[in-house]
């Protein structure tokens, strides 16, 4: 196993999640949220707004806490860690995730699984970097070689060590809270009025809600794309840029139809190494959870040129 043998000899500087920085942003965000509540609604609804905002923040974190159990059922994932690997490529997956976990100083190694799908993809999920799970599709194992598989796994492990699942949930909480702040005054106006004023207030509520949803989707998608670039970069650093580039080129072949896909699933697309449903136009790219493969490959090629200097 040339690829894995090279990885064993590579010195890796493990990144560390800056909890203080995350806590600072959360505190500032909460302060800004309640300030907006006071500006827009005054004292009238402050009594129950905190509870509603807490619910808006709490929902993404509850989803994060149960994410492993949810995806295990949704994807019919077969766990292959602790001697469960039955093929050479499954053993490669286990060995690679184990080795990367050691090099990245994880206190607890991720659970490792394979799911039955022709979709050539992989994803990471879990409430924290020490309670994570990495899963790959059978289609990926059937279609990629050793270095490509290592590149994909390094990308997913980068999500784990960067705490991307947690930061994504924090962002979703802020987006949900923004939706509550933006729409609830209009909904309360509908309840407090009658006739034409009520109809007008309800129409305004739906309009503002849709605008808030679109804005939230744009913000979360922009962060997701930035997160993917970061995972690509770290994956290239802890393995080799050629590994990540090779994996992305293979995915590009798939996206261009040179390799057929079946049974693709939109659910959990934002957690995967690529999103097969991204649109090519400017409007579509605004809502894409992943950058285009061409842009990701170009970013890796720039890294290659830098490292060769």
UniProtKB/Swiss-Prot annotation:
Membrane topology of this protein = Multi-pass membrane protein
Compartment(s): Cell inner membrane
An example GO CC term for this entry is:
plasma membrane
Q: CDD domains, alphabetically?
A: M48B_HtpX_like
- Top-rank taxon of the source lineage equals Bacteria
BP term (GO), one: proteolysis
Q: What is its EC number?
A: 3.4.24.-
Q: What is the cofactor note?
A: Binds 1 zinc ion per subunit.
Q: Provide this UniProt record's keywords sorted from A to Z.
A: Cell inner membrane, Cell membrane, Hydrolase, Membrane, Metal-binding, Metalloprotease, Protease, Transmembrane, Transmembrane helix, Zinc
Q: Which residues bind Zn(2+)?
A: 155, 159, 228
Q: Name one GO molecular function term.
A: metal ion binding
Catalytic residues of the enzyme: 156
Bilayer-crossing regions: 22-42, 46-66
Keyword Phosphoprotein attached: no
Q: Which cofactor does it need?
A: Zn(2+)
Q: Does this entry carry the keyword Lipoprotein?
A: no
Q: Which family does it belong to?
A: Belongs to the peptidase M48B family.
Q: What is this protein called?
A: Protease HtpX homolog
Provenance organism: Fusobacterium nucleatum subsp. nucleatum (strain ATCC 25586 / DSM 15643 / BCRC 10681 / CIP 101130 / JCM 8532 / KCTC 2640 / LMG 13131 / VPI 4355)
